[in-house]
């Protein structure tokens, strides 16, 4: 009688799954962490709610109300979750039948769309972006049959550019009555004029992902939001865990979204954008850098001569960047989070010392 291992008992798609390689999972012994698009310094909060013997609210009112006020929408159009990553998964669980429906996304882009779908057993379809990293609308149209959720990251991670708003409108018209379009706006605080939040009334099938991990400087909190019309939110509420946010997380999130918290976030954005422009200008003068791409975010994508050697050389010096070589159309590319001036200088000095 053959022995069945524990791994044999697991679902086939889980056995075959390659987990998402987060910056933390990839590790490294760095002291300059520029690989996860985090804010470079800690922001301090004091806990005010100490009733930890009670379960938290499923959707903490102060957090929902504050976020709705900030985003300019109704509280009924907001769902809070454990990071935007949970929102990605909830949308698939609510709308996609495993083994029947598909999601669609446009690489090069964020890796969690595919991981979430594969974990649940939902087909992934890809339509690579055009040479300028804008949407291939004809390609998307050709592959929409059976697709229930389309993910579009704007500004896009890792390329840093915004998706053309007219293309978003065309996509929303193509998918009307067929699929949910998800605009991943994790980095929208760095270019707030480009948000699609004002489009929700016009498009009942639009959902928007947001996070406190980037401009709000709270990656360690794991707090994200899905903005959508009430009908979509009610469906997501059916599949979300009963207590997604712990009491301390809800406490700090509500403070971060207070009027003072919003002012502080906007000050951080101004500072990061100034630092980004400084770093872009410096990178353009460095011999081993072939190309620096425009960015609307808190990171910069650049193409390097001998990028793998450059990546390893900086890694060995404790400067951890994010290698994008395996992404479609990004051979030779590394992504650099915008950090402090001292961190920028470490990167610039290390790159200048590279022999090309």
UniProtKB/Swiss-Prot annotation:
Question: Could you say which cofactors this protein requires?
Answer: pyridoxal 5'-phosphate
From its record, what is one biological process in GO terms?
Answer: L-histidine biosynthetic process
Q: Which family does it belong to?
A: Belongs to the class-II pyridoxal-phosphate-dependent aminotransferase family. Histidinol-phosphate aminotransferase subfamily.
What is the annotated quaternary arrangement, including any partners? Answer: Homodimer.
Stored NCBIfam families? hisC
Enzyme's top EC category: transferase
PROSITE patterns xrefs = AA_TRANSFER_CLASS_2
Give the protein name, as stated in the record. Answer: Histidinol-phosphate aminotransferase
Q: Which cysteines are joined by disulfide bonds?
A: none
């Amino acid at each position: 009688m053959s022995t069945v291992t524990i791994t044999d008992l697991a679902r086939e798609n889980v056995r075959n799954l390659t987990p998402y390689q987060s910056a933390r999972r990839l590790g490294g012994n760095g002291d300059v962490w520029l690989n996860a698009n985090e804010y470079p310094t800690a922001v301090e909060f004091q806990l005010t709610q100490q009733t930890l013997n009670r379960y938290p609210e499923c959707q903490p009112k102060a957090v929902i109300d504050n976020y709705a006020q900030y985003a300019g929408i109704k509280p009924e159009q907001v769902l809070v979750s454990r990071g935007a990553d949970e929102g990605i998964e909830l949308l698939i669980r609510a709308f996609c039948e495993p083994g029947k429906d598909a999601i669609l996304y446009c690489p090069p882009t964020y890796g969690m769309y595919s991981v979430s779908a594969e974990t649940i057993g939902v087909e992934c379809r890809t339509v690579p972006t055009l040479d300028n990293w804008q949407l291939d609308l004809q390609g998307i149209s050709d592959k929409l049959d059976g697709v229930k959720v389309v993910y579009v990251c704007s500004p896009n991670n890792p390329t840093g550019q915004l998706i053309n708003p007219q293309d978003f409108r065309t996509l929303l018209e193509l998918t009307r009555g067929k699929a949910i379009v998800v605009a991943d706006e994790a980095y929208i605080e760095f270019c707030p004029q480009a948000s699609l939040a004002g489009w929700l009334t016009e498009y009942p099938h639009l959902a928007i992902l947001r996070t406190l991990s980037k401009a709000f400087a709270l990656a360690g909190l794991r707090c994200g939001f899905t903005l959508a019309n009430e009908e979509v939110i009610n469906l997501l509420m059916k599949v979300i865990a009963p207590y997604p946010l712990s009491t301390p997380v809800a406490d700090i999130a509500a403070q971060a979204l207070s009027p003072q918290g919003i002012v502080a976030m906007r000050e951080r954005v101004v500072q990061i954008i100034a630092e980004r422009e400084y770093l872009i200008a410096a990178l353009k003068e460095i011999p081993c850098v072939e190309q620096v791409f425009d960015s609307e975010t808190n990171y910069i994508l650049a193409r390097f001569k001998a990028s793998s050697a450059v990546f390893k050389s900086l890694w060995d010096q404790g400067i951890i960047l994010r290698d994008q070589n395996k992404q479609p159309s990004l051979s030779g590319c590394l992504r650099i989070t915008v950090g402090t001036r001292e961190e920028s200088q470490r990167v610039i000095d290390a790159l200048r010392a590279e022999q090309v």
